[in-house]
């Protein structure tokens, strides 16, 4: 009875804390400006199935894709066992599904989970070595120093502990059943690991304690992971699906029109026009200076970022030694958004995304090639943020690199980037 009460309290507390934090994150995302992402629902659903559920873009790099796929499948299938854990926790039973007419199906499912857990254990060690021993370049860039690196390693540690607790529970149960009836459960891995690690224990009470340690350890790791998730880059586990559904379906390279500019043009063409949303107190702004100037999809992108670095690894500006890192753009956006969240969603703290987090040098290093957008496994669009920040620099602060000043002047005067009169534009065709 005590265990049921403790389990119930922990469950309510854990879910309550997680819900409270997620409400805060959603409130932060809703600070963004409106953007239309509800058109073409069938195509959006197809994109979500292929990119998020099917992991389509992950397989551009087969080795890491296979390792991640093991994690992904194990995470989904293991939830079946978690259902049993919760039923046992609320009812005070133990392996309730084993004692039913579906015993063989139950053994098959647990065996599948064990095989996947073992593969995940190997994949976890591989991921750890890639980050800390092999030290792949994209995992050792300056934006990952400090907390981001600790975050990645901490989640790998959680995964290892979770797997150890699962096999402790199953192995002790297997050894206990063999001791008492000479016939075990027959789980794929525990039928070997149980006797190997616990076979010398001849006291069923000790085996029961070990099983409970594994059960409670498994449960606590789930609760810890659940409430750690909103503070970690692994929030993409939840946000990858809506983020891919709300992907930009326009062709890459197509820039969005600015509503403020469109309104200004309409007013220039028809001075008598007064748009319904504009009042005499409304001051049009161009581009984005802070997170509240970006769209809600930009902010969802920031929280969906996995910090995998695929975007940065293909960025031509970064490859040639420039300051730009698309991954850092997304990380900075999320960091600023979290700071605004701590200020009760108030952006008026004397700071801004542009300047305090992202520098002008980073923005102007971007070639707008869309390589980062193409490479992202969850369809994040760093270029959209970069363009909006550059628009603010140009249209609000008149800050333009000298390399672009001549081009913009020519476009204004001649309607083309070149310093030729429009009347002379076709003279080259007359040359021999």
Language-model features and meaning:
Residues 112, 146-147, 206-216, 294-306, ...:
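Flexible gly/pro/ser-rich segments immediately N-terminal to CXXCH heme-c attachment motifs
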Residues 6, 22, 62-72, 76, ...:
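Peripheral terminal and linker regions in Fe-S/redox and tRNA-modifying enzymes
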Residues 274-302, 318-420:
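Ferredoxin-type iron-sulfur electron-transfer modules in oxidoreductases and energy-metabolism complexes
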Residues 26-29, 219-221, 308-313, 366-370, ...:
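Short acidic (Asp/Glu) and glycine-rich catalytic loops that position anionic groups and cofactors
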